């Protein structure tokens, strides 16, 4: 059975969705009650946290604060659909046009989702050429940039430029905003990602296969990309069907997951008197 608990803001929409689901279940000879909507009051969540006899797993979907609250208070196992502080690293041997297209897509195609880019890292040897070409592309969408000292110097004159603080590099903006940092090399980029990443989706743009493999091997994330946008981290895109969430933990599921990850195994052994 599946028990759903939605927010009060979407209560009418949730009820409508449940009605449709239950109608389909009945039409196919299944009991409608296998999918149930709980009242939106907060007290019902507290009861779920301790219902270890009846509930196998909780999957919180929502803000980082909500997910953290569920994880810290639940006695029932939790699959975290964590926040995404996602990075794109433009390495010194990147194709600049390709890097601009990937960066713009990762940031602006849908900025309010967890697989959107939040921080851009650029190799110092390509920073000036790349950022000057990226500037009008992001400016077209009025993207607000929080730049470190080196990037700020290059981007000076960009109308939506701000000086970055350390906190900006760990922010999930969920908006047309991003942090930009110039790094010395791939090692510094990887170290930065290790410090600030939520282990969701991380990308490198480069034509150097050795540097790409180094990045893909060293970065610990549910999805790592070479020359592609972080926006592909999605159940439908990965061929999994309807997505339940994107997990940033390593157990029980990691990355985009669908119904298959919510089933387990049962061993059935038929014998004829065998003993051990």
Where is each model-derived feature located?
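Short, structured coil segments at secondary-structure junctions
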Residues: 54, 74, 141, 219-220, ...
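Short, small-residue-enriched loops and turns at beta-alpha junctions
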Residues: 9-14, 153-154, 233
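General structural feature for long, well-ordered alpha-helical segments within catalytic domains
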Residues: 13, 17, 40, 44, ...
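Short, hydrophobic beta-strand segments that form beta-sheet elements in well-ordered domains
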Residues: 38, 58-59, 144-148, 181-184, ...
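Conserved C-terminal structural/oligomerization subdomain of aldehyde/semialdehyde dehydrogenase
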Residues: 165-276
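Rossmann-like NAD(P) dinucleotide-binding subdomain of oxidoreductase/dehydrogenase enzymes
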Residues: 1-93, 97
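Flexible, glycine/charged-enriched surface loops at secondary-structure junctions
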Residues: 29-35, 111-116, 142-150, 201-205, ...
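ALDH superfamily catalytic-core signature
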Residues: 67-175, 226
């Amino acid at each position: 059975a599946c028990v759903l608990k939605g927010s009060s803001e979407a209560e009418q929409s949730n009820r409508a969705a449940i009605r449709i689901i239950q109608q389909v279940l009945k039409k196919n000879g299944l009991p409608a009650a296998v999918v149930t909507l709980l009242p939106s009051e907060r007290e019902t969540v507290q009861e779920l946290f301790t219902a270890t006899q009846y509930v196998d797993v909780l999957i919180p979907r929502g803000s980082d604060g909500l997910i953290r609250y569920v994880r810290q208070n639940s006695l029932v196992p939790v699959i975290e659909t964590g926040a995404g502080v996602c990075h794109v690293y433009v390495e010194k041997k990147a194709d600049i046009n390709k890097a601009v297209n990937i960066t713009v897509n990762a940031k602006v195609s849908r900025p309010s989702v967890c697989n959107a880019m939040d921080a851009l890292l650029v190799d110092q040897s390509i920073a000036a050429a790349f950022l000057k070409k990226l500037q009008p592309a992001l400016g077209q969408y009025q993207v607000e940039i929080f730049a470190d000292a080196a990037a700020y110097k290059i981007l000076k004159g960009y109308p939506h430029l701000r000086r970055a603080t350390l906190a900006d590099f760990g922010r999930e903006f969920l908006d047309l905003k991003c942090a930009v940092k110039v790094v010395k090399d791939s090692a510094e980029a990887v170290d930065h990602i290790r410090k600030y990443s939520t282990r969701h989706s991380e990308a490198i743009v480069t034509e150097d296969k050795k540097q790409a493999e180094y990045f893909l091997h060293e970065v610990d994330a549910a999805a790592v990309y070479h020359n592609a946008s972080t926006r592909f981290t999605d159940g439908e895109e990965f061929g999994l069907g309807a997505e339940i969430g994107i997990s940033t933990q390593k157990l029980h599921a990691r990355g985009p997951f669908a119904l298959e990850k919510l089933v387990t195994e049962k061993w059935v052994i038929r014998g004829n008197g065998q003993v051990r």
